[in-house]
């Protein structure tokens, strides 16, 4: 059996960049990581609570955290920032204040910026949320996968692979189903491949969604 490595970690420093940019003393490193995890979870929960979308897609592609001695800069890359801004006009300021209180960053200023990504459905996280929403609404998994592939074709990607694992359609025996369109060269480090794994809770149990998107490169 081939041992599968995380495609993003495999390409760090070549086609992929880090999502956390800061330095710390070795003894404080774990604290910094935990803080990052809490910040990301807090932002995701806030967006989930305040976004009114019919599709159930939050649209967060990634959250970048840059830390300096006196400043924590958080950049949220979103596919549909307009929905968040329209549903809560002062949402960003509110989120900033809540985060500052939550993490007691008295000595450090906390700044949040939102960046819109041009082709939302070219991002695996947003696509996984879309598929999860479809599965929760009891849409057939094959239909959901095909619709996701159609959406990525509009985003000019070179290839996509979607995998769903678990008790699909409520069957008693768990199985893995996958579909691939175009090329997905996982062994080529120069190929820019975006990846995500996402867990969705349905009435039949938990399903795992994995998506690989080949953007460009080689």
UniProtKB/Swiss-Prot annotation:
Its main location: plastid. InterPro entries: KH_dom-like_a/b (IPR015946), KH_dom_type_2 (IPR004044), KH_sf_prok-type (IPR009019), Ribosomal_S3_C_sf (IPR036419), Ribosomal_uS3_bac-typ (IPR005704), Ribosomal_uS3_C (IPR001351), Ribosomal_uS3_CS (IPR018280). Signal peptide: none annotated. Gene3D superfamilies: 3.30.300.20, Ribosomal protein S3, C-terminal domain. PROSITE patterns: KH_TYPE_2 (PS50823), RIBOSOMAL_S3 (PS00548). GO terms for biological process: translation. PANTHER family: 30S/40S RIBOSOMAL PROTEIN S3, SMALL RIBOSOMAL SUBUNIT PROTEIN US3C. This is Small ribosomal subunit protein uS3c. It comes from Lactuca sativa. The gene is rps3.
């Amino acid at each position: 059996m081939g041992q599968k490595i995380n495609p993003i970690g495999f390409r760090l420093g070549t086609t992929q960049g880090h999502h956390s940019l800061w330095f710390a003393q070795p003894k404080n490193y774990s604290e910094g990581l935990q803080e990052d995890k809490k910040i990301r979870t807090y932002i995701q929960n806030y967006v989930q609570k305040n976004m009114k979308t019919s599709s159930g897609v939050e649209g967060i592609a990634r959250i970048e955290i840059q830390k300096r001695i006196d400043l924590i800069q958080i950049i949220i890359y979103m596919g549909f920032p307009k929905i968040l801004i329209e549903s809560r006009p002062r949402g960003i300021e509110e989120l900033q204040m809540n985060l500052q209180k939550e993490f007691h960053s008295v000595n450090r200023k906390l700044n949040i910026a939102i960046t819109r990504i041009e082709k939302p459905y070219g991002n695996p996280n947003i696509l996984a949320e879309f598929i999860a929403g479809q599965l929760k609404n009891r849409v057939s998994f094959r239909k959901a996968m095909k619709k996701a592939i159609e959406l990525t074709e509009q985003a000019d990607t070179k290839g996509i692979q979607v995998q769903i694992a678990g008790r699909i359609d409520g069957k008693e025996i768990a199985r893995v189903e996958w579909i691939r369109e175009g090329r997905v060269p996982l062994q080529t480090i120069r190929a820019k491949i975006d990846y995500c794994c996402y867990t969705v809770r349905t009435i039949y149990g938990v399903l795992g969604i994995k998506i690989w998107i080949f953007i460009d490169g080689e």
